Amino acid sequence: MTQFIEGKWTAGLGHEVTSINPANQEVIWNSKTATPEQVNTAVDAARNAQFDWFMLGFEARLAIVEAYRDQLEANKAEMAEVIAQETGKPQWETATEAGAMIGKIGLSVAAFHKRTGTSENDTPAGRAVLRHKPHGVVAVFGPYNFPGHLPNGHIVPALLAGNTVVFKPSELTPKVAELMLKLWEKAGLPAGVINLVQGEVETGKALASHPQIDGLFFTGSSRTGHILHQQYAGDPGKILALEMGGNNPLIIKGVEDTKAAVHDIIQSAYISSGQRCTCARRLYVEKGAAGDALLEQLAVAVNNIQVGAWNAQPQPFMGSMISETAAKGMVEAQRNLVNLGATPMVELTHLEAGTGLVSPGLIDVTDVIELPDEEYFGPLLQVVRYSDFDEAIKLANATRYGLSAGILADSREDYDYFLARIRAGIVNWNKQITGASGAAPFGGVGASGNHRASAFYAADYCAYPVASVEADAVSLPAKLSPGLSI
């Protein structure tokens, strides 16, 4: 009974699917997918519930959202454990994800008031009022890398604005989604306000193409995001918010504390086994003795990164990738780069057959003439040596993506020069580029998104503005327009 439609748990009527722990192949979830007919029922349920949900008013909606926050707080250990088992991420990391889900509530409320809400100004003839209204029924497509936090960042602001939701999580992390919906149910959410449809491509296509949804919020691959963008191109009445990852650059220039630089590089490239959309994929290091020394330190540190199962003790820095298929894909990506002329500095290896466990890789691609502009979604960092700062920035910008970028540099002047020229939605200085503030927008340009930044700006795509000029009574103006006689 793993579909949640119209406030009731029901079995899927499609084909059987399982979710496995990628670190040990243990089956942790088993069910059947939602059929297109069940997706249709879910959308109908959301449509039928939407106006009443909106008319409850903000304070009543907020009370239910805050009850959900309380449920998350009470069940954060279970949430962290389920995320760890299903994604393979170590427990220390999934505990931070569960905490981020709780913190998202307060941030979303603040964003609602600051970015949307209601404002009023007096005018000579009455008053001008700005309000925001929900789009209606929105679809939320969740990713596997942050299966709780990222869909939560769409769902919470959507509900606060008065929308209802049909949630289609990644087929790789269905158990996390199921737990989320159980907590919403305990929070007293009215029937139909959130509907959960579990499934694979067929389920996703049925939801994305449904004529009765008013918007779709997507986090995932650039390939799928571009398909959705093309699909929605002729339908301007529907809001589409896309976050699609990046081929993110990190430049090192004139850093005295090389140990700190190595730490920030590792946190940028290898956290979450490289499965964050903001992870550094390309590292630009100056040619010369200083750059050589930095890379020697980095190679030693990368070799020393501890990799293990989600529950290993002592806890590893890197857990499993999401699947054995993903792990094999990273080995193949490394092989392709070597065939193009790259030189491994630390070889990425598949540690155990049947699992997603890989060791982190570091590879020098300076001699690759045409470096593929690909997001290799795993722990493989490509090194490019440079001799000129302008050259490094030009190479950093040589991507169709534009999500995150960063520079480690002791000089503020170097940072300002970089900031003015780099093309990315998240630009950090002397901090890991996987670090982003929840009180700021999150999104990129180019193939990384469609100018619908999430996080603090998610409120913007969850509602549309309604501008009104109002007066308490109909009245004649003090002076009629020329040519009128009443």
Curated annotation (Swiss-Prot):
Entry keyword annotation includes NAD: yes
Its domain of life reads Bacteria
What gene is behind this protein?
astD
- The active site is formed by 243, 277
Entry keywords, A to Z: Arginine metabolism, NAD, Oxidoreductase
UniProt-listed GO biological process terms: arginine catabolic process to glutamate; arginine catabolic process to succinate
Protein's recorded name: N-succinylglutamate 5-semialdehyde dehydrogenase
Enzyme Commission number(s) of this protein: 1.2.1.71
Entry binding sites for NAD(+): 220-225
**Pathway this chain belongs to:** Amino-acid degradation; L-arginine degradation via AST pathway; L-glutamate and succinate from L-arginine: step 4/5
Q: Which reaction does it catalyse?
A: N-succinyl-L-glutamate 5-semialdehyde + NAD(+) + H2O = N-succinyl-L-glutamate + NADH + 2 H(+)
Q: State the protein's purpose.
A: Catalyzes the NAD-dependent reduction of succinylglutamate semialdehyde into succinylglutamate.
What the record says about family reads: Belongs to the aldehyde dehydrogenase family. AstD subfamily.
Tagged with keyword Oxidoreductase: yes
Q: Which GO terms describe its molecular function?
A: succinylglutamate-semialdehyde dehydrogenase activity
Which PROSITE patterns does the record associate with it?
Answer: ALDEHYDE_DEHYDR_CYS (PS00070), ALDEHYDE_DEHYDR_GLU (PS00687)
Q: Which Pfam families match?
A: Aldedh
